[in-house]
Amino acid sequence: MSTPSQRLQAIDALRGLVILIMMVDHVRETFYLHQQVPDPMLIPGTEESLFFSRILAHLCAPVFVVLTGLSAYLYQAKNNSAQMTREFLLKRGLFLIFLELIIINFAWTGQFPPDVIYLQVIWAIGLSMVVLAGLIGLSQKWLWVISLSIICGHNALDQVSFSQMPILQNLWFILHERGWIEFGDLIRFRTSYPVLPWIGVITLGYCIGHTIFNSTYDVAKRNQILLGFGLASISLFIVLRMINLYGDQAWSIMPTSTETVMSFLNLTKYPPSLLFILWNVGLGLILLVLLQRVESKPWVKPLIIFGSVPMFFYIVHLYVLKALYLTAVTLFGTTHGEYFGVDHVSTLWLISIILTVALYPLMLKFSAFKHKNKHIRILKYL
């Protein structure tokens, strides 16, 4: 059996990879707002580079959530205590919800006090951790049943509505349907990330950890099983997508082959459909296996560093983007209607590369500080 540190390096590397991809999407949301993309995207009129950049970013949330569940099991295995794990998940989940409501929402809106709070990915991860804290006392069989039932079955609930029952409707907005929860004229909450499917994904990560990240399997066997899981997930995605009956909106043959591929990959993220989860979690598990094989390579170290301080990076990069945007508006004014924006998707990637290089020294220093000061409790949440 590999040591926890060996395991965590590949996990941190994958986490680092997806948060850097995520930053590209956040650069898009900062400097490309004049080209809005709905969910799912509209194929006609969406430039190919924008479409595939967005599709790549779809990898981020499901991979991050499944790794959160996997890491929860590794924490439990390291401490040999379900109770400690339950307390850790509860505290960290509530901490993430606090960050979303106060720190992260301000980075997006610049409003304090806010009149709108967007409940986005950090909120979804935090609430999912709170729910997982209550589930880990169940048997593995029931955890697998709960996880797979949510992931595979939640699309059957797509047409459910409680429009005549406001309290239930607000709860449904939190669980499965994007919507607005309003408290008079005081404040509104936008449930950007309905949480029910993410509860299934985080529980799946925990189940994967419990099943194969233990003394029963050595590294080679574990990677073989992970690869099998990943390939099976993608294969099931392809089969269900070809059948075109369940798991997401239907795709269609388009005027060009590229547009047909775009239609095939045009999946629903809010909330994440069955097919969205199958495709992206499958790719994530395959990437985890590949990174396990190259984790000692020098070029992987920066990914490990970024992945070791994910929440610190998340907060810092949002405020850096906000500062850059306000500076650009001050210097150049609005260039695309009410927004300042760049003209090409390639510029978004260039900005992202520059930010990656610029932020790496800070992440390196904070990662070292975090590991040298484990007695500072709040650091383990960052």
Residue positions per predicted region:
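Alpha-helical transmembrane segments and their immediate juxtamembrane cytosolic regions
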Residues: M1-L382
